[in-house]
């Protein structure tokens, strides 16, 4: 399978790319702004089928930068994992307009832009996996300081449901994994001192499995994946 993963330079995205690359039948396009960290995916036995592409998913030129790189290596895309995300932890009264823009541009607009850019290249029966959060699930426990982050992930969940219906005729499946806690830098930023029962690598094991197989059973679903929240 040809798989595109955003936010692949750290945390769950990095580990998901590493896990998927262990199967040499897969080719991975790992996307992130940070080339130096992306380079860590290359060394070793699993590195030969990983293509790294430093790219700003918010401000980058998809048509002139990402797509030429993609089509030079893949003739189609079988799976897209929209993993890149941004978190700001602030009391509501201290938020500024740029916080809103930063969060929604990364967590929502970039997901929209990536799907729109890759749509002509998505294979029949391709799978789009949007990485959401339990904070974006209606009725879930909410936490002070995470209003913008949770709202942005709620938007991703609704976008997932809408696109699953729009893409039925194309036979493209779209699902959202609403993740609970995993030990990442983002979790430490939101909940200093909290220790998750799951490592980033352990959460990535499920994300990788679901990316490859989840569309056999699900379409347009927002699926909680959480031992704790946090």
Task: Place the predicted regions along the sequence by residue.
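C-terminal helical subdomain
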Residues: 169, 176-177, 192-230
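Residue(s) in the substrate-gating loop at a strand-loop-helix junction
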Residues: 133
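Conserved glycine-rich cofactor-binding loop
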Residues: 9-10
């Amino acid at each position: 399978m040809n798989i595109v993963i955003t936010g692949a330079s750290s945390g769950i995205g990095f580990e998901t790319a590493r896990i998927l690359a262990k199967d040499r039948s897969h080719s991975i396009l790992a996307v992130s702004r940070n080339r130096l960290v992306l380079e860590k995916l290359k060394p070793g036995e699993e590195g030969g089928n990983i293509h790294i592409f430093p790219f700003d998913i918010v401000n980058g030129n998809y048509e002139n930068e990402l797509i030429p790189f993609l089509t030079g290596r893949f003739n189609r895309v079988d799976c897209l994992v929209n993993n890149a995300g941004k978190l700001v932890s602030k009391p509501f009264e201290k938020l500024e307009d740029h916080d809103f823009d930063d969060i929604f541009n990364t967590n929502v607009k970039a997901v929209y832009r990536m799907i729109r850019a890759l749509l002509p290249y998505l294979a029949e029966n391709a799978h789009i996996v949007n990485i959401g959060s339990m904070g974006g699930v209606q009725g879930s426990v909410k936490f002070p300081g995470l209003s913008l982050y949770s709202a942005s992930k709620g938007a991703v969940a609704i976008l997932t449901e809408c696109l699953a219906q729009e893409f039925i005729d194309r036979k493209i499946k779209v699902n959202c994994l609403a993740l609970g806690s995993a030990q990442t830098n983002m979790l430490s930023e939101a909940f200093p001192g909290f220790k998750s029962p799951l490592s980033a690598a352990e959460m990535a094991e499920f994300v990788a499995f679901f990316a490859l197989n989840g569309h056999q059973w699900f379409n347009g679903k927002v699926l909680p994946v959480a031992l704790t929240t946090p």
